[in-house]
Amino acid sequence: MAKKVVALIKLALPAGKANPAPPVGPALGQHGVNIMAFCKEYNARTQDKVGLVIPVEISVFEDRSFTFILKTPPASVLIAKAAGIERGSGNPNKTKVGKITTAQLREIAETKLPDLNTKNVEAAMRIVEGTARNMGVTIAD
């Protein structure tokens, strides 16, 4: 028989840098999960993606064991990395902070495809383009 899930925890953590300090410790500790076991496993599975923020969905079972699913990094993080900027514009309609090419946009859309609610790369590109526009990043051909 399948184990019963008692909690579903969603966190966004830097790849390869999870530690028991907040927000990881309190989120997992209240459900009785072995925090160090999670940190070691998360860091091992994300060590090749250092520098990105990787969202994780942790399922906690009634026997205090857990499993987790790694998601793709947020589109805003991928866009900022491609444009070479720290953060988006505070006023995206007036102040543009960077540029990405259509090829970079397609690459980001293909990376995000598993987590988006579409199977079409063109639709994914439009979704990511909207995020870029809201960050003050322009798309050059």
From Swiss-Prot:
GO cellular component, one term: cytosolic large ribosomal subunit
GO BP terms, alphabetized: translation
Keywords, alphabetical: Methylation, Ribonucleoprotein, Ribosomal protein, RNA-binding, rRNA-binding
UniProt xrefs under Pfam families: Ribosomal_L11 (PF00298), Ribosomal_L11_N (PF03946)
GO-annotated molecular function: large ribosomal subunit rRNA binding; structural constituent of ribosome
Post-translational modifications: One or more lysine residues are methylated.
Coiled-coil positions: none
Claim: RNA-binding is one of the keywords in the record: yes
InterPro entries: Ribosomal_uL11, Ribosomal_uL11_bac-typ, Ribosomal_uL11_C, Ribosomal_uL11_C_sf, Ribosomal_uL11_CS, Ribosomal_uL11_N, Ribosomal_uL11_N_sf
Protein origin, superkingdom: Bacteria
Keyword field contains Chloroplast: no
UniProt record similarity statement: Belongs to the universal ribosomal protein uL11 family.
HAMAP family in UniProt: Ribosomal_uL11
PANTHER family: 60S RIBOSOMAL PROTEIN L12 (PTHR11661), LARGE RIBOSOMAL SUBUNIT PROTEIN UL11M (PTHR11661:SF1)
Function of the molecule: Forms part of the ribosomal stalk which helps the ribosome interact with GTP-bound translation factors.
SUBUNIT field: Part of the ribosomal stalk of the 50S ribosomal subunit. Interacts with L10 and the large rRNA to form the base of the stalk. L10 forms an elongated spine to which L12 dimers bind in a sequential fashion forming a multimeric L10(L12)X complex.
Protein name: Large ribosomal subunit protein uL11
